[in-house]
Amino acid sequence: MGGGVLKQQFVLHAPFLPCGDQPEAIRRLSQGITDGVPAQVLLGTTGSGKTFTMANVIANVNVPTLVLAHNKTLAAQLYQEFKAFFPENAVEYFISYYDYYQPEAYIARSDTYIEKSLLINDEIDKLRLSATRSILERRDTLIVSSISCIYGIGSPDNYSSMALTLEVGKEYPRSQLSSQLVRMHYQASSTPQRSAFRERGSVIDIFLAYESDLAVRLEFMNDTLISIEYVDPLTMIPSHTTSSITLYPGSHYVTPEAVREQAIRTIREELEQRMLFFEGRPVEQERLFQRTTHDIEMIKEIGFCKGIENYSRHFTGAAPGEPPTCLLDYFPDDFLLIIDESHQTLPQLRAMYRGDQSRKQSLVEYGFRLPSAFDNRPLTYEEARRYFHRVIYVSATPGDLEIQESRGHIIEQIIRPTGIPDPLPEIRPAKGQIDDLLEEIRQRLRKDQEKILVISVTKKLAEDIAAFLAELGIAATYLHSGIETAERTQILTDLRLGNIDVLIGVNLLREGIDLPEVSLVAILDADKEGFLRSSASLIQFCGRAARNIHGKVICYADRITPSMDHMLKETERRRKIQLDYNQQHKITPQPIIKPILANPITKEAGQEETRLKMQSSKELEASIKTYEEAMYQAAQEFQFDEAVKYRDLMNAAKKQLLFQKGEEENGD
């Protein structure tokens, strides 16, 4: 296990104090952790301030913490919130770094091999490395992660053993230092870029793999290190000095030489065994021999090869079938695990392993990979549970598993700081539901800034309703999984800005929608039993209207299903608690005021590129600078879809500038 070395305290910064149910929830959760309770549930209604409660608990127990979210969007939201709560501490972000990923596969029936194809997001790679660096260095580390935390990465022992500590006044032969940096996956480069270094006379500049705001300048007299400075990576202006520094590797897959040599030996042994297995199958034999020996040569020469993760077991020394090392192994034993939206996250944990193994079966069976590739995988659910020493499950609708594992340690957080109670759903006949819905929509359109969410049972119905409303002059659109992430973000922004009044979708829970303007949630065909009409889903849908003081929920159904009955009883129970609290404390519900962050890209890339062709060289240079600044700003704010668009526009502007300069030179 990795262990922190610096013992800073978590320092909570908040412009408000806990209120409502929060103080009691914070006290009980904190006490439970202190008392060694292995699992607790925070059952908090939508809008009750669960993240703020979590932040207070983290500050109280003061141990390294992992917050697990079920998708990247939610992880980014949580990261930004915790970053604001803990500006003095190491709040980190760990998600999949693939912008695009096509896994390696073989389809036997058509003899089709699909090579792995991927595009790594450089900014997210930096954040992942920053996360592991922090958890190894300091105790006041909070990492917000997606399900990526259960996927194999390099061993924390290998990673930390390859870290390089330098001290002013000591001697470091320059050639050996350069070689060590290369082994740490830093490349020699004359231009400043992440995971690189450059030598100029007595100075070595190192552009860290896990930092974008600071680079390191080492100054030598002969081989004696006389100065360590942190500098701005763009201007190279010094920021501050230090007497010592620990540099961490540029990859999680770095290995010491002895480990690498041992891995090469065991890979060869496995290859020999597999060649015997494929006796009489010359195609598979030759394929596996060529591929594996090429990989071995690459590992010998540069310590790395394409697809090195498929040999990870050989580098960690694990036996076949043993769990892979993952982010969880970088944490000390006493860490706190918070699983947000646990009713969705836990099923995800269960599903990851099965899909991974079925794909690799053909690759191993037909000689594309050694059997050890099976061990480059996510943890199984049972393996992941071994890390659940101190866990808090957080959900408005926890599942049976969380309830069972918490053994009665369930802490409710029902009261909202705004005083807004849960809306009590109305049940109306499914027959004529569209006509009734239309009248409800028209009533809200007469008011200012009131929006409507409509939950349908199919994508086709969502599209048809949106088209029907649009024909009547109502600003409506649909939202479902067939729409790309960037467009979904723009649709939600347009709803808040008033460009859209009605949003129709199938599973609007997955979008992480937090829209205080929504005053009506209409659930069509609420009596159609299924995953999206379960009691948990219905309660979650109702919560979408609980951020508006005029919030209303209508369920269109011809009968009351068991799921609907449970939803109605639970909503009524919560609503009574909330109203009694408001009356007792003389609280008047207040509307939520949430700033609207408009999508900065309002034109299609094609239109922008057409406009670029009409610009002069000087204007193009200005556009390049503008797009570059916007790209970095979007990346820092975790708006990666926007960052990619700005990057593409910047590259288009650069291409156009080169074209224009070429024409100018030819004209001369």
UniProtKB/Swiss-Prot annotation:
GO molecular function: ATP binding; ATP hydrolysis activity; DNA binding; excinuclease ABC activity
Biological process terms in GO annotation: nucleotide-excision repair; SOS response
Keywords in alphabetical order: ATP-binding, Cytoplasm, DNA damage, DNA excision, DNA repair, Excision nuclease, Nucleotide-binding, SOS response
SUPFAM superfamilies, alphabetized: C-terminal UvrC-binding domain of UvrB (SSF46600), P-loop containing nucleoside triphosphate hydrolases (SSF52540)
Keyword Mitochondrion: no
Motif Beta-hairpin boundaries: 97-120
Organism domain of life: Bacteria
Localization (cell): Cytoplasm
An annotated GO cellular component: cytoplasm
Binding positions for ATP per the UniProt entry: G44, T45, T46, G47, S48, G49, K50, T51
Keyword Nucleotide-binding attached: yes
InterPro entries per the UniProt record, alphabetical: Helicase/UvrB_N, Helicase_ATP-bd, Helicase_C-like, P-loop_NTPase, UVR_dom, UVR_dom_sf, UvrB, UvrB_inter
Domain Helicase C-terminal: 433-596
Entry domain remark: The beta-hairpin motif is involved in DNA binding.
Family assignment from sequence similarity: Belongs to the UvrB family.
Protein's UniProt name: UvrABC system protein B
Species per Swiss-Prot/TrEMBL record: Chlamydia trachomatis serovar A (strain ATCC VR-571B / DSM 19440 / HAR-13)
